[in-house]
Amino acid sequence: MPTYLEINRHDLREADYVRTPTAELAPGQVRFRVDRFGLTANNITYGVMGDAMRYWDFFPALDGARGRLPVWGFGTVVESRHHDVPVGQRAYGYWPLGSELTIDAGRLDGRSVVDVAEHRAQLPSPYNRYIFTEHDPAYRVGFEDIQILLWPLFYTSFVVEDFLDDHAYFAARSTVISSASSKTAIGAAFLAQRRGTGPVVGVTSASNLAFTKGLGCYDIVTTYDAIESLDRDASCYIDIAGNRDVTQRIHHHFGDQLTYSMIVGDTHWDAAAELQLPNVGPKPEFLFAPVQIAKRTKDWGRDGLEERVGESWRLFGDFAQQWLTSDVRTGASAIREGYFDVCDGRIAPSVGVVCESLT
């Protein structure tokens, strides 16, 4: 029977397994076994923003008060009633935190299949696409865990940095990034440093300071306690932390020297959410990645965009292998424990939780 970790939508620290009957496939449907997936702070953000951004709508739970958290990873077709999707086909994509997923297979293009189920029709299309491993430009043998843990985060990093480059970094001479030890921040810093538009400044906790400095993708690294010691040069700010207190202090410190303020994530999802947005400097703007992706698809074409992302991804993957290790959790009990470890911030930034064999 399929097994899912269902989470209280209003208390992410409450999560238990449910088992559901196996439904017979209808014509055109495909059943995937979820083989291996990652758990990162990004998944916790999906839960925090689940109602506002409709993340809970991808894989509805039977109980509307609970949700099935989306995760990224690899799955294998174990049953198919679609003649173009054979049993044994492997794909990378967006799964529920569970043992399997049944999709309504459609829009096959030789490289991927899309879940065209009615409940996903109005949700962002990139999340509905399952890319066959043999045709996946992001896939490399020996880099599966890197892809599981970093690919969706890196795509966000690419869009963040590309958006800034598309606007000439808003005339900033330096780039300040909060939650600098987070994987999305590291990707953005790696790309910004390669762009060479000026110093890349990372802000992190004291406990992650040594790790973040050791990465080499930041020119300057400081702690949250030392924000006010940063040079007040013309700067743009990438808010990965989602901590309103940090944003307030960045804005008040840089004042009119802050040329742009971008909100990306919520790695500090449980901190100071009730504080008001700053009234000093530019109004923070939320990055809606699909808009920039659509713009670049128009500018470069789909193949041109994928080529640029792919080239950057290969470089970043080689870089990530130097500092990222996998903490593999096997079986239901270990996976649930891994979820709580990520939720409560007990995973070192140099480690990624990879889950397998949830049956």
Give the positions of each predicted feature.
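A short N-terminal beta-strand-loop micro-motif at the entrance of redox/enzyme domains
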Residues: R9-R36, A41
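Glycine-rich beta-strand-centered segment in the early N-terminal region that forms part
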Residues: L25-F37, D51-T102, R107
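NAD(P)H dinucleotide-binding glycine-rich loop of Rossmann-like/cofactor-binding domains
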Residues: Y94-S174
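N-terminal Rossmann-fold NAD(P) dinucleotide-binding loop
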Residues: A185-I186
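Adenosine-nucleotide cofactor-binding segment
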Residues: Q193-T247
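Short acidic-hydrophobic, aromatic-tinged amphipathic segments that line or gate anion-handling sites
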Residues: D219-I227, F288-A289, S326-G331
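Glycine-rich phosphate-binding loop and adjacent beta-alpha segment
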Residues: R249-D318
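C-terminal hydrophobic helical "lid"/dimerization subdomain
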Residues: I293-T359
